[in-house]
UniProtKB/Swiss-Prot annotation:
The keyword Transmembrane helix does not apply. The lineage of its organism: Bacteria, Pseudomonadati, Pseudomonadota, Alphaproteobacteria, Rickettsiales. GO terms for biological process: rRNA 5'-end processing. It comes from the Bacteria. GO terms for cellular component: cytosol. CDD domains: YqgF. It comes from Rickettsia africae (strain ESF-5). The keyword NADP does not apply. This is Putative pre-16S rRNA nuclease. One of its GO terms (molecular function) is nuclease activity. Belongs to the YqgF nuclease family. InterPro entries: RNaseH-like_sf, YqgF, YqgF/RNaseH-like_dom, YqgF/RNaseH-like_dom_sf. SMART domains: YqgFc. SUPFAM superfamilies: Ribonuclease H-like. HAMAP family: Nuclease_YqgF.
Amino acid sequence: MIIKNLQEFYRLLIPNAPLIAIDYGSKKLGIALSNQELSIAMPLNTITEINKKIVITSLLNIIEKYKVCGVIIGLPIDMSGAVTEQTNIVMKFAEELAKSINLPIYLQDERLTTKAANNLLKSFGVKRKDRNNNDDAVAASMILETVLDSIKNI
């Protein structure tokens, strides 16, 4: 189920279980995982498959493996706050994922996270090819970190 309110999302979480975050792109998905205490976000991996059924199966495997209690999906909103074509694509994906899992899903504004992730990797001297392979997972960890920081204030 997609939850629009962060406090409600937090209330539905199982204690001592991690969250995953997804940075959904047209060519790949970045995945990040929190620790059980919901205090640290770490890049996990990148899914380069574009077939939605295979993507959802991969996500279900990750959810089961790490015993995840909730999912955060980065929502790409225009800098002005307007909904874009990519926003609608991500919302549709979130709805499809919600049909496959019985976990709360929260959509988090993700403006500029992939660019920030790429810049961060660049500042560490990571080569372009490696940046392009990892920037979505790092962006997912930034999205997750934003939510974890907000949860601390609930």
